[in-house]
Amino acid sequence: MNKIRTILVACCLLPVFCSCGEVAKRMDAKLAESKAAIGIVENTETDGVGESSLASGGKKSSATAAADGEYTDLEIPARLTSVPEQILRRTGYTVSYNSNRRVPNWVAWCLTVERLTGNSKRSDAKFHEDTDVPEPRAVDFDYVRSGYDRGHMCPAGDNKWSALAMGESFLFTNVCPQAPQLNRGDWNEMEQACRKWAKQEGALYIVCGPIFYKNSKKTIGKNRVSVPDAFFKVVLCMTGEPKAIGFIYKNGDGNRPKGDYANSVDEVERITGIDFFPALPDEIEDKVEATCNPDDWNI
């Protein structure tokens, strides 16, 4: 009887293990498709403008790292076809750069507790132009007396783990003209919230960037760096029950609770035209992107 009971239990559990294995395999396949679509090829070094340097930034090498709660490149959005896109792979993040606007389309990175610790200091780094993109490109003088801050997309505070990562976070391809009230206020508070979530929840997959409305024409500086109308941020957590949330901030004054900026990822996709987290299995992607529940994030 015990043998029969053991066999029955094993038979019941087998579909569960098979299901988990199938999800991992599909994620591996979709990750490979996503990276290939935007020109990211594993173990390829930078070879000039437009190529992708694959510094791993300390992440696992495959989606099979799910067992440790971290997937490689799960944060990378789908390829953009309606705007210029040059993919730049940095130590701590990946950029989709728009040469017409001189700012990123998006910046994506994985945030973990390990990345929040280290001796690298913001004070040791300076903003500098990115020579991996063609001229005209943003330079420091474009921001002087412009009325806008040099607003990090992937924040310096998420790159304390590496001096190289910290320095690269100050490249102007990771920067947008940002209203001082936003950069030093609600946007900064959201960056701090993401660090808190990473410590409490585990690895986060984050994408953020500028939003330009139809008639956006404002620029700053000699190089005509485009000034965004708003900014977005989407956050995915795969620890336990997968969940995601989006945020949209106007590029101006603001002093409101985080929940006031919250949106579903689907809504952020509708506004930006960007397909986020395409490597997720469809059943997971559809579920987490349709949901906006600030209570899940304690906001």
What are these regions (language model features)?
Residues 1-8:
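Bacterial N-terminal signal peptides that target proteins for export
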Residues 8, 15-299:
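Domain-level detector for secreted/extracellular nuclease and nuclease-toxin modules, and
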